[in-house]
Amino acid sequence: MLSWRLQTGPEKAELQELNARLYDYVCRVRELERENLLLEEELRGRRGREGLWAEGQARCAEEARSLRQQLDELSWATALAEGERDALRRELRELQRLDAEERAARGRLDAELGAQQRELQEALGARAALEALLGRLQAERRGLDAAHERDVRELRARAASLTMHFRARATGPAAPPPRLREVHDSYALLVAESWRETVQLYEDEVRELEEALRRGQESRLQAEEETRLCAQEAEALRREALGLEQLRARLEDALLRMREEYGIQAEERQRVIDCLEDEKATLTLAMADWLRDYQDLLQVKTGLSLEVATYRALLEGESNPEIVIWAEHVENMPSEFRNKSYHYTDSLLQRENERNLFSRQKAPLASFNHSSALYSNLSGHRGSQTGTSIGGDARRGFLGSGYSSSATTQQENSYGKAVSSQTNVRTFSPTYGLLRNTEAQVKTFPDRPKAGDTREVPVYIGEDSTIARESYRDRRDKVAAGASESTRSNERTVILGKKTEVKATREQERNRPETIRTKPEEKMFDSKEKASEERNLRWEELTKLDKEARQRESQQMKEKAKEKDSPKEKSVREREVPISLEVSQDRRAEVSPKGLQTPVKDAGGGTGREAEARELRFRLGTSDATGSLQGDSMTETVAENIVTSILKQFTQSPETEASADSFPDTKVTYVDRKELPGERKTKTEIVVESKLTEDVDVSDEAGLDYLLSKDIKEVGLKGKSAEQMIGDIINLGLKGREGRAKVVNVEIVEEPVSYVSGEKPEEFSVPFKVEEVEDVSPGPWGLVKEEEGYGESDVTFSVNQHRRTKQPQENTTHVEEVTEAGDSEGEQSYFVSTPDEHPGGHDRDDGSVYGQIHIEEESTIRYSWQDEIVQGTRRRTQKDGAVGEKVVKPLDVPAPSLEGDLGSTHWKEQARSGEFHAEPTVIEKEIKIPHEFHTSMKGISSKEPRQQLVEVIGQLEETLPERMREELSALTREGQGGPGSVSVDVKKVQGAGGSSVTLVAEVNVSQTVDADRLDLEELSKDEASEMEKAVESVVRESLSRQRSPAPGSPDEEGGAEAPAAGIRFRRWATRELYIPSGESEVAGGASHSSGQRTPQGPVSATVEVSSPTGFAQSQVLEDVSQAARHIKLGPSEVWRTERMSYEGPTAEVVEVSAGGDLSQAASPTGASRSVRHVTLGPGQSPLSREVIFLGPAPACPEAWGSPEPGPAESSADMDGSGRHSTFGCRQFHAEKEIIFQGPISAAGKVGDYFATEESVGTQTSVRQLQLGPKEGFSGQIQFTAPLSDKVELGVIGDSVHMEGLPGSSTSIRHISIGPQRHQTTQQIVYHGLVPQLGESGDSESTVHGEGSADVHQATHSHTSGRQTVMTEKSTFQSVVSESPQEDSAEDTSGAEMTSGVSRSFRHIRLGPTETETSEHIAIRGPVSRTFVLAGSADSPELGKLADSSRTLRHIAPGPKETSFTFQMDVSNVEAIRSRTQEAGALGVSDRGSWRDADSRNDQAVGVSFKASAGEGDQAHREQGKEQAMFDKKVQLQRMVDQRSVISDEKKVALLYLDNEEEENDGHWF
């Protein structure tokens, strides 16, 4: 029991433990299941979210697509709306125009109506007056009638009373007394007469009034009618306008409908097109598969047929003992007998071969009978001079199709079929050419019918167009080696020659080649079906080259390209037909032809191919283990010709096969042949090229017409009278072509022909001269190049579209090329090559020197000179382009290019040594002249360089325009040119080593055209001669007053003449390079403009002035004499230049100063100026000062320059006007300044802006043009002297303020430039003793001016952005008589004008860099009248003292508007690119207003200029101080953006007169 308990106790514990573990496991499993459920829920949720995100993405994409579609629709709708808007705008403009017209018409009618109404009112008033007069007259008449009646009654009463009284007294009636009766009667008559007259008068007046009334009524009715008609017309016009509006609406609706319909149609057609494209692609794939299968089958079939046919032909040819026997027999036969008897032998052998073959039912050899063994041996070597190929004599009959003369289509297609199956046999009757003046006899053997066979075999021979028989030995030595090709562009090679008899000897053949004319052979086909069938078969055979053959062909083409002897040889298009020959004979024969190596000239077509004539080596090797039988080369040639006849079928292009009238001659020439040895067999690869050749006799015009009517690529001319033939061909080719542009390229190059074999001694030809006939007119394109070797002239005509480049030959030749052309279709070239003496050890890479004058029609000439000694020099010529210059530079010669107005070329030539040191540079300039110009090139190349230019250009002067004649006039005279001319000094300089010769052409240019000063030229064109006289007088006067000699002659002109006694003017040409040796790259980069090369240095005209007191050098541009001096300081390349020029009232001067940057300067008219240009160190950082003074008359200014480098200041007792323009690396600044003195109405135009001022007094126009990345046109300042009450100043800027004051002129101007818009300009003018207060304020400037009688204070505050950058306070402590001041700062700057004693304190803060500049300027001296304009200059400060009363300080602002910053260090000076450069300084005064008496005023100027150093935008610290005493200083410096200059040439002219001046006694002017 106990034991059981003991035993069961542990088991129970184990079971409990197991249960506990099981419970834990189950709990763990349940937890994991819950976790799995949670994870699955989360995964499902995430998948749902991903699905939602994908749906959202799809929704977004769909929305984007819909939005894009909406955008497209909206764009279309916008375009439609814009179109409708434009239509409505046009309609509105039309309606407005019509409305204006109607209003004008209505206004005219209203005016007429008013006039009529006024006339009506006047008529009515006159009528009323007349009615009133009528009433008065009637009343008067009634009164008169009443008085008359009363008087009558009274008289009657009195009479009655008297009668009664008498009757009463007397017994009877008594008669009145006679006196009373007379009175009564007379009174009655008088009254009756007056009454009648009165009544008549009244009736006339009434009649006139009625007539006037009637006229008035008629005019009123007419006016009413006209009014009614005008109303009707206006209504009709309104109706018409309404109808047009409705019509326009209908048309627009119709347009919209048509657009929709067309859109629908276009969509439908696009769908149809897409369907057709799909169908086409499917058909293309199907056709490609079919053609690929068919090609594979054809390749297999062709390979088998070709191999079998070749083997059979070779075996038959070698197994026929008659060939070997005949070959041995014919070697011992005389040449003449053999030539006459070979026809019958060939025919007999041909028939026997055919009989043997037919009996054995093999492929007939007759299919290759045109290259049978006998005929090939006899005729294969003939005509090697003209490039006849082996065995190609009898192939002319079937040139186009390449068929055998007696083979049928079935035979060619199936090489090995039985003859009995050939029932459809066609015979070919070729037409043979006429062989003139040759001993060759052409026989056509009649066809002989054979028993049991229906075929007719016409055997014909002698169609070879170049039968030039030689002796047998010569034929063995000279296997035909002509390489030519019949290309798809129908290239022809026509052999031209004289009619000479052909002898059998080799020397006679070479010296007297024959001419044979061959007509094109005609082919006759039985039916069109068979013709097309033959073409198809030919095409099938042409497509039988497999991929391996094409790969081998490309590989061999590459290898041959490497093996070319000279760069002039290019390979023609070739076809390689791989042929595997397995011959069981151990015979290795080698034929090494040594024919004439005739280089075939470039055909020059669009493909640019060159034919290549090389020495050909033919090798037909067979290797077998059997015997070692040695045969001669004739038997080898049999096999060669058999293979050639087979390969001939593959060398025809489909175009030539399809043509019915094909070329008469096809030559198949072996180009390369390789033997690839293999196991038990040898593969022979033969590369074949073919060419069509036709011989035409050009001795008569019929043959020449035939030649010129064909599309000929290359013409070879044989004969000694080659140059005569050229003229005939050109003249004949020009008949009937006068209406078109004609160009004939004639290139005649005579040079020895080199022989590869080297067996014969070299002969050299003599220099050859060709003189062109005077009346030869330009003709069609052709190129004649003549080569002479061993007394043989071979002139090749080539119709080309490109200029020929002379390739290196055996000897260095100098070629003069004269090109003449009509329109831009082409040109006429004459290459005249004159070989040098022929040294024996020349390489092939020597070269030639080209001097070219290309004459074309549009009055320009293009002349260039080039040597091609160094390999790799390439000539590129401007063809039919714009007139200009182009520098052609080889890639491998880093020679600097020099470019003047005419161009100068420096070259070195070393011709007789193996090393070549050349720097070829070509400058070409075009001058087109009429094509009637003809020049004789005879002997030109043997003369001096100047003579060559003189002879050519001397004939051009009458046909050139006047300006071009002036430019070229210096080339035709030897003497020194005066001002305004061109002088050229062409001379040869022998090098130090003696092995090189340098030709130096120095060109003196005196006429320049600057685009920026055309207006100045127009203004002062008439006074040029007066200006020249004034300049010369000024220079002489100034030289006579110089008392101290110059420090020395300039470095640029080392070794110049010493000063001589007296003053003399001598003009000489020079070339000044202002770029130090270490700075050529920097300067080149700085002065490089896009698209053209800039010169390394300028070409300037120089006047050397020698006097006892010193030596000066003057450069002349535009007829201004100048004196120049260069001071070179120390090894650190510190140099300075000083300039002074003297001008008359209207002089023009262009100055170009090229230092580290290239600058140009132009002076205002009537100004004297002096320029000091100081450059420190190799960094070429310029320091410039500029002062410009205007005076009424020129006198003798003198300038004194400090010898040490540093900032320079200048002062003078004159008013100044200047322009200072500088450009850095990124932007350019150009100012234009025109100064007029006197009553001138002037207009100055610069760039795209135009300004005009009109006034009675002095006028000044300053134009500032900034060409930079940020700023555009900066502003224009126009200033008029206060000679009138009101001054108008117009500026092209943002805002203009003008004020007119009664006693003075005040102008306050604000100019904003660029994105920052913080440019401020103020002008405060004090006029007389009247105090004026001018105040103007805008968003960025504040000006306060206070004036009193004696003290004036002005405070200027310049605001830039959010910062005050300049504060000024100026106190004027004396009476200012008249001193207008204008302060125009393109950057922030200020100016003070003082009169008497002035004190000026200025504190300037420049931007965030806190650069401060403090100045204290004290000036003493009276002033009469001063104008001051101040603007910030670039790097240096520009100081002016006019009448010792004014000073200008220019401070460059902070980094926002850095004008020009530079770093200056003693050891390293480098330029920092600047962002903006806007500066202008202008000073104007009236004549005589600045004159000072003999008194001279002390002038002391203290300058302290500080700038904090920083990054590229912060100015480097510079401190300079200079105190100078100046009597006169005139300076002008200008830099022009190269992109704004029209002409390509950059010119530099420096004019200075440097002498340490002394005190002057009298007036200056």
UniProtKB/Swiss-Prot annotation:
List of residues that carry Omega-N-methylarginine: 1487
Localization, UniProt: Cytoplasm, Cytoskeleton; Cell junction, Adherens junction
Ranges for region Linker 1: 50-58
IF rod domain residues: 11-322
Compositional bias per record (Polar residues), positions renumbered to this chain: 402-421, 1087-1105, 1354-1379
Location of the region described as Head in the Swiss-Prot/TrEMBL record: 1-10
InterPro entries: IF_conserved (IPR018039), IF_rod_dom (IPR039008), SYNM (IPR030634)
Protein keywords: Cell junction, Coiled coil, Cytoplasm, Cytoskeleton, Intermediate filament, Methylation, Phosphoprotein
GO biological process: fast-twitch skeletal muscle fiber contraction; intermediate filament cytoskeleton organization
Renumbered residue ranges of the record's region Tail: 301-1565
Modified residues (Phosphoserine): 429, 653, 777, 1044, 1049, 1077, 1087, 1181, 1184, 1435
Region (Coil 2): 187-300
GO molecular function: intermediate filament binding; structural constituent of cytoskeleton; structural constituent of muscle; vinculin binding
Main location: cytoplasm
Stretches for region Interaction with DMD and UTRN: 11-320, 1244-1563
Chain positions covered by the region annotation Disordered: 401-421, 472-609, 1019-1060, 1080-1105, 1198-1221, 1332-1415, 1505-1525
Gene Ontology CC terms, in alphabetical order: adherens junction; costamere; intermediate filament; intermediate filament cytoskeleton; neurofilament cytoskeleton; sarcolemma
Pfam families the UniProt entry points to: Filament (PF00038)
Residue ranges of the region described as Coil 1A: 11-49
Expression sites (tissue/organ): Isoform 2 is strongly detected in adult heart, fetal skeletal muscles and fetal heart. Isoform 1 is weakly detected in fetal heart and also in fetal skeletal muscle. Isoform 1 and isoform 2 are detected in adult bladder (at protein level). The mRNA is predominantly expressed in heart and muscle with some expression in brain which may be due to tissue-specific isoforms.
Similarity remark: Belongs to the intermediate filament family.
SUBUNIT field: Interacts with GFAP and VIM. Isoform 1 interacts with TLN1 and VCL. Isoform 2 interacts with DES and DTNA. Isoform 1 and isoform 2 interact with DMD and UTRN.
Function: Type-VI intermediate filament (IF) which plays an important cytoskeletal role within the muscle cell cytoskeleton. It forms heteromeric IFs with desmin and/or vimentin, and via its interaction with cytoskeletal proteins alpha-dystrobrevin, dystrophin, talin-1, utrophin and vinculin, is able to link these heteromeric IFs to adherens-type junctions, such as to the costameres, neuromuscular junctions, and myotendinous junctions within striated muscle cells.
Name the UniProt record assigns to this protein: Synemin
Top-level taxonomy: Eukaryota, Metazoa, Chordata, Craniata, Vertebrata
